[in-house]
A protein has these predicted regions:
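Conserved AdoMet/S-adenosylmethionine-binding subsite of the radical SAM
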Residues: 84-236
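Conserved Radical SAM active-site core
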Residues: 3-15, 27-133
Length: 236
């Protein structure tokens, strides 16, 4: 399967509220892109990249733009999977605010040619900086608890951008030490960092000791509203 500039594979499209980050609570249209270049051990959307996970649908840019244009929400959220595998700059329409959730391993303004497993290849041109700089980017760089390797070149790119915030998901207090080292290494301001708690149950999100530690270190706490309200239900 060859995925190029004019092909978009989508796992699901739905309306809900943004659950995390600097726009938590806003009414949004979510477009969840299929495929990811990572395989994080605790991923809560494995159906977007696990080969036997089920169906996805192919769209053209014009088909997705029509859905976006006719949707009720003002906020449009590209999530995944990994949206940056695709030409997101070709999906904009007037009168909407676009958000992207990325794993921080791919630079959007460079051309990519990535082999994904044995059957899938991503080949897209560089995105237009003028367009993507109008997006609200949520850069979710992975910690060691994901068992994934950092792409330092990509992180250095994101550290220079003014149009993004950083989101981390932690399991324990030791993860905060790793975040501290990360932001010092790449020169990231604490006020741009939002930290949430790993897990897909209500109980996993109500851990006062961890929340106290997050705010005592000067970070923003990011509640994961979708987990608190609906657990791990799809389409939420």
């Amino acid at each position: 399967m060859q995925i190029t500039d004019n092909k978009y594979y989508i796992s699901e499209i739905f309306e809900s509220i943004q659950g995390e980050g600097n726009f938590a609570g806003v009414y949004s249209l979510f477009i969840r892109f299929h495929f990811c270049n990572l395989t994080c051990s605790w991923c809560d959307t494995k159906y977007t990249w696990f080969e036997k996970s089920g169906a996805f649908k192919e769209y053209s840019a014009e088909e997705l733009k029509s859905i976006i244009r006719n949707s009720k929400p003002y906020h449009i959220i590209f999530t995944g999977g990994e949206p940056v595998l695709y030409r997101l700059d070709k999906l904009t329409v007037e009168g909407k605010k676009f958000h992207v959730e990325t794993n921080a391993t791919i630079i959007p303004t460079t051309k990519i040619d990535i082999q994904q497993g044995a059957k899938t290849r991503f080949s897209r041109k560089a995105m237009d900086t003028r367009i993507i700089s109008t997006f609200n980017w949520v850069v979710a760089s992975k910690l060691s608890n994901s068992n994934q390797k950092l792409n330092e070149e990509a992180i250095l790119y994101w550290a220079k951008q003014q149009f993004c915030i950083y989101k981390f998901i932690i399991q324990s207090l030791t993860d905060l030490d790793e975040i501290e080292q990360f932001i010092q290494k790449f020169g990231i301001l604490k006020q741009k960092v939002y930290i949430g708690l790993e897990g897909v149950t209500t109980e996993s999100q109500i851990r006062g000791t961890l929340v106290d530690a997050i705010i005592n270190r000067g970070y923003n706490f990011s509640p994961r509203l979708q987990v608190l309200l609906w657990g791990n239900e799809r389409g939420r």
